[in-house]
Amino acid sequence: IVMPGLVDCHTHLVHGGTREHELNMRLAGKSYMEIMNAGGGIHYTTTKTREASFDELYEKTYQHLNDFLRHGITTVEAKSGYGMNWETELKQLEVANKLQQNHAVDVVSTFMGAHAVPKEYKGNEDAFVKLLIEDMIPKVAKLGLAEFNDVFCEKGVFTPAQSRLILAAGKA
């Protein structure tokens, strides 16, 4: 029997923590930005991902890939973006690349350092954009860690102008 494999084209595969505790907030009508501004959302997962070791992330994500495969998914895009600093973004991408080598599911990495503005750059968003453009994106490219570059263009996160700069840097 031959069956097609499914593709999950938008996952943040490698991350620490879970956010099911935010479900009640969503059910109560809170917006994504309200949850994030209250310390949840991306910032919560960023904290948990920064705290997790390479091995913890690898083992957890390997099990997730087993679940994907059981449901017919044979290819996933693995976005980073829960580090928002070089060390953790690198850790996420290296975990994804090791999984690509060791798991039956095809893992295609996307650098998404521009998932949110880290708390330490609040009020100085342009400095973070500059860090992404001048430092992080070139390092990812030089090391061959990702096939793609992405940005979260949303009110309160990255503006269209900032997003264009980030995406252009990824093409360079």
What is each stretch, according to the model?
Residues 1-60:
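Metal-associated gating/positioning segment near the N- to mid-region
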Residues 41-60, 66, 74-172:
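Metal-coordinating catalytic core of metallo-dependent amide/deamination hydrolases
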